[in-house]
């Protein structure tokens, strides 16, 4: 563990969706987001992680479409399902036409009332559900290494 920093922010996407205006929720409910592994914000760190894992596909771009709002299969609650690291545009819209609404949604998702900050310590263990929570590791421990082990479970396709 680094002597300082390295916390992770978690954001509740149920609340992010539920606090949008009724008109905004109606607009978003039918939209599909296009997500890319090659988005400039994440491409470099992704390539480094895959290269470090000795995978030959580090530079391969993965593109997938998901609903902007998904329904959690177990709770039935609706959650905002766009991500500043991967969502590049809305289906049938250009990146330029999508940009303003996406930037609004990305900022909305990060509102303090939706987030908590997890301070890692030796032996810490965290569980979260990517279907309704987003996480953001804070890279503020320059010159130090943070080693963690992650397990990702297979899940359902967003609906």
Name each region found by the language model.
Residues 1-125, 130-159:
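Non-heme Fe(II) oxygenase catalytic core, chiefly the N-lobe of the double-stranded beta-helix
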């Amino acid at each position: 563990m680094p002597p300082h920093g390295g916390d992770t922010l978690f954001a509740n996407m149920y609340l992010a969706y539920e606090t949008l205006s009724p008109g905004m929720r109606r607009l978003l409910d039918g939209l599909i987001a296009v997500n890319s592994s090659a988005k400039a914000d994440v491409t470099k760190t992704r390539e480094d992680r895959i290269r470090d894992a000795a995978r030959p596909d580090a530079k391969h771009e993965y593109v997938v479409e998901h609903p902007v709002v998904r329904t959690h299969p177990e709770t039935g609650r609706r959650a905002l399902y766009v991500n500043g690291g991967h969502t590049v545009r809305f289906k049938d819209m250009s990146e330029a036409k999508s940009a303003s609404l996406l930037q609004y949604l990305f900022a909305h998702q990060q509102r303090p009332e939706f987030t908590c900050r997890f301070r890692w310590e030796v032996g810490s263990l965290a569980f979260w559900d990517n279907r309704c929570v987003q996480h953001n590791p804070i890279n503020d421990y320059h010159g130090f290494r943070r080693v963690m082990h992650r397990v990702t479970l297979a899940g359902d396709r967003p609906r």
